[in-house]
Amino acid sequence: LDIKKGETVCLIGTNGSGKSTLLKLMTKIIYPNEGTIETHGKLTSLLELGAGFHQDFTGRENIYFNAAVFGLTKAKIEKRVDDIIEFSELGEFIDNPVRTYSSGMYMRLAFSVAINVDADILLIDEILSVGDEHFQNKCFKKMLELKKQGKTMVFVTHSMESVKRLCDRTIWLYNGKIRMDGDTKEVVEEYVKETR
């Protein structure tokens, strides 16, 4: 499986088909039993709500912590912190410990940080299915903007509408294997026919 620089690829399949496992392999959270995984470029991911956040830190402290983990200097973080907070729309809650956040608030903070760490590759695993419709739409618009900038994105979702709107290429996984890989319209049509 090769994903080219600048591609926006969606992974689809029923629960348990291997979509999230593939993303975890790409981020090296887990390692393959055989074969190798290579990534070229700086990678950021949104895989599980709350992953990478220190629960006792405030949202603001977590911005600094996460951005530093991704290699941003304190000076770069200082320049971006207001943009991150503004995009997240967390307002005064940014100074509360993240353990007090709802799932939607976690998603707001995680997405806002992820789009501001200068990553070349963005992996997103269904995290955008939480939160309110307004913020989901805002994230979707930002992803379209990142796509136009030539960022590489791999996106897992069960929303076929999102797949059709965002992805150049779709990979249908079934029992850990690629069932179909190609043009989004064709793959989605086959997937919908088969899973009805």
How does the language model describe each region?
Residues 64, 76-93:
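Conserved ABC ATPase "signature" region
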Residues 163-165:
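A short, surface-exposed alpha-helical micro-motif characterized by mixed small hydrophobic
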Residues 181-182:
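ABC ATPase "signature
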